[in-house]
C-alpha cells in the first residue's frame, strides 16, 4: 500500500508547483472551508491537500490541489489506495479508471517493515533508481466542490517486497503525461511502471 509520501525540501520542481497552486481560486476555496493546503515540504499523510496533475475541462494539463483520500459512506477511514489489478472492475473506481486519472508528484514514498505479527517496525524512504520527480499514478473524483484522489498500487517489486507486498504505481515522466489523457489505455501504461527501487532507513 502507500499511506505516506514525502516532498523533500530541495525538490524545487514540486515546491514551485505548491507555490503556484496556492495562488489559485481553488486554494482560496479550500481555505474558506477551513481546509489548509500544504505550503512547504514535508511528510504527506492522508487528508492532506497537495498538488496533483490532471486534465481540465478543456483537456489541458493543469496542476490542481486535491485532498488525499475518498470519503466512504460506511466507514470513517478514508479510502487512500486503489489496486491496479482490480480498479477497472470496482464501482468506486470504474469511471475514474477511464476518465479521471491524475498523477501526484513526490520525492519518496514511505514504508515500514513488519514483524511476523504484522506490526510496523523500521521506517524507510523509497524511490526509483532514476533521478527526478517521483510520479505516483492516481484516480480522482469530485466530493462536492472538493477534488479528492487515491494512489494506485501494484504488487511490490522484489527490491522492496520484504517490507510490504504492495507499492505505488510509479511512472516515468512521459508515461505520467500519457496516464492522465483519456484516450490512452491505463492498464498498458501501468504495465510500464518503474520497478527497481532504492531505499534508505528513515528512523
Q: What does each of the following model-derived ranges do?
A:
Residues 1-203:
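Short linear sequence motif anchored by a di-proline
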